């Protein structure tokens, strides 16, 4: 394995201003990296302390020339690809395929064109590639069976990356569901947390029977950093907690944290026919490659989210 030496520390992160990117920036800086990264052109720059020391470059992943120039300027030792059309329920599949496949190819071409070879290129895929056909604990040997456009685009991205394995030390991460402070309420757990933090009496949800392997975003970025530094090129790794929680268990945790029970209504508009029914992962391969990693209990993550949101509400009251 090729390891990045402490004397040479610069990382280039796509999607740096996104939910995961901000935590990745903190993780990289704490490890001694100078952080460069992309943000969507025209988007307002966030006033976020996590990004205060970062070099932000407004670049569209579909603009191959601009991406090539940005990568050449950064000359990174490590590349972390987080930018994507990331929500399963996105209603523009053409854009999802463009960004997640063509955008990734543009990044790999840009990275391969840098005058010094990066020591690691981490691509964030998704455990959604496993689909909903295989019950139980999923490891990386399970045949992919994507059940929606987002998952198909991520699997196609993985296959596209194989074309660059002879030129770049590519590592693919398949994160299962994860959450934390700052994630959009378009996702399930932040939606639930927001309702409880606001003391709302009721909530409308979709499929109550789903089970998910939930991680804390801080644990996910810790795993990404370990993979960058170990650089096991050509391999694919689940990033997960190895524990699946039902929606009922999550609601019970939030009820204990918030101090009341919310009234739940199942709204057919939120029920997706192709919903992945159960996702639980094995991280045995990850453990062998990088050693033990932290696993934050889900109730601690939820409490962090509820307390933070309530604190923000009190500050603006």
Cite the ranges covered by each PLM segment.
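Conserved Rossmann-fold NAD(P)-dependent oxidoreductase catalytic core, especially the SDR/UDP-sugar
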Residues: 81, 105-149
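NAD(P)-dependent short-chain dehydrogenase/reductase
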Residues: 135-136, 159-213, 217-226, 251-257
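N-terminal Rossmann-fold cofactor-binding loop
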Residues: 38-43, 61
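C-terminal substrate-binding subdomain of Rossmann-fold SDR/epimerase-dehydratase oxidoreductases
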Residues: 198-317
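Active-site helix of classical SDR
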Residues: 153-156
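NAD(P)H-binding glycine-rich loop region in Rossmannoid oxidoreductase-like domains
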Residues: 61-99
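Rossmann-fold cofactor-recognition segment
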Residues: 50-63
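N-terminal Rossmann NAD(P)H-binding glycine-rich loop of SDR-like oxidoreductase domains
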Residues: 11-31
């Amino acid at each position: 394995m090729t390891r990045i030496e402490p004397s040479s520390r610069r990382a280039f992160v796509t999607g740096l201003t996104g939910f995961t990117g901000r935590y990745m920036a903190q993780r990289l800086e704490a490890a001694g990296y100078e952080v460069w990264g992309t943000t969507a052109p025209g988007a307002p720059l966030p006033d976020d302390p996590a990004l205060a020391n970062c070099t932000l470059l407004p670049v569209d992943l579909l603009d191959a020339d601009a991406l090539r120039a940005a990568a050449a300027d950064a000359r990174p030792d490590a590349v972390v690809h987080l930018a994507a059309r990331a929500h399963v329920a996105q209603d523009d599949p053409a854009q999802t395929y463009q960004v997640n496949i063509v955008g990734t190819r543009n990044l790999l071409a840009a990275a391969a064109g840098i005058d010094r070879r990066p020591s690691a290129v981490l691509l964030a895929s998704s455990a959604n590639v496993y689909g909903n056909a295989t019950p139980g604990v999923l490891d990386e040997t399970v045949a992919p069976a994507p059940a929606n456009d987002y998952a198909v685009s991520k699997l196609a991205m993985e296959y596209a990356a194989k074309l660059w394995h002879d030129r770049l030390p590519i590592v693919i991460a398949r994160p299962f569901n994860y959450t934390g402070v700052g994630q959009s309420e378009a996702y399930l757990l932040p939606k639930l947390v927001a309702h409880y933090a606001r003391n709302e009496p009721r909530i409308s949800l979709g499929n109550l029977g789903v089970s998910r392997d939930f991680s804390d975003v801080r644990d996910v970025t810790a795993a990404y950093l370990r993979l960058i530094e170990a650089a096991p090129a050509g391999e694919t790794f689940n990033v997960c907690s190895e524990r699946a929680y039902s929606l009922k268990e999550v609601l019970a945790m939030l009820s204990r944290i918030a101090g009341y029970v919310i009234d739940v209504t199942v709204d057919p508009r939120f029920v997706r026919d192709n919903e992945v029914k159960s996702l639980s992962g094995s991280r045995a391969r990850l453990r062998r490659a990088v050693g033990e990693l932290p696993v934050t209990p889900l109730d601690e993550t939820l409490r962090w989210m509820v307390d933070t949101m309530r604190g923000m509400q009190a500050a603006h009251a």
